[in-house]
Amino acid sequence: MIIRSFIQVILLTVAVLIVQLYIPAFSFNDLDIIADILIIFLTYMGFYYGRFYTIILGFIFGITQDLITQIDLLGAMALTKSAIGFGLGTLILYRNIWSAKSRMLFIFLMYLLHFMIFYFIKFNGVSVPISISIQVISIHSFLSFIILLVMDKSFFPHGVTSD
């Protein structure tokens, strides 16, 4: 049973990485905004498997994103995805205690924290107005959260958003 579950996670991981590669980007103030499907997958990993696997998978996702998209910031996404993997892994501990609204608030705050840390690292030493930074962080967080809600309601009847 454990081997079967492990193989399923590996296959889903490969599928999610392929989907992430082909997600279209849009431009906002000369900055590319790309939906982060990987953080949504980490949310489900944290909800169903816990911290350890979510941290490991977060690091793998992060270093993969670093190598593919931003070699100049090598390690930035690995750091943030690992840290957020720790936070999202907490979901399994409070699965039966927190209400759906509490879980949703926690997940949104984790997404917000993830993008705040990443863009703090990315914009360090670059003159980007704080208002643009806040807008980009907000857009990324809301976009990821909305995709999570749509996926959860459409494909997972007993997922993260259900009581």
Range-by-range predicted roles:
Residues M1-D163:
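Terminal, non-globular segments
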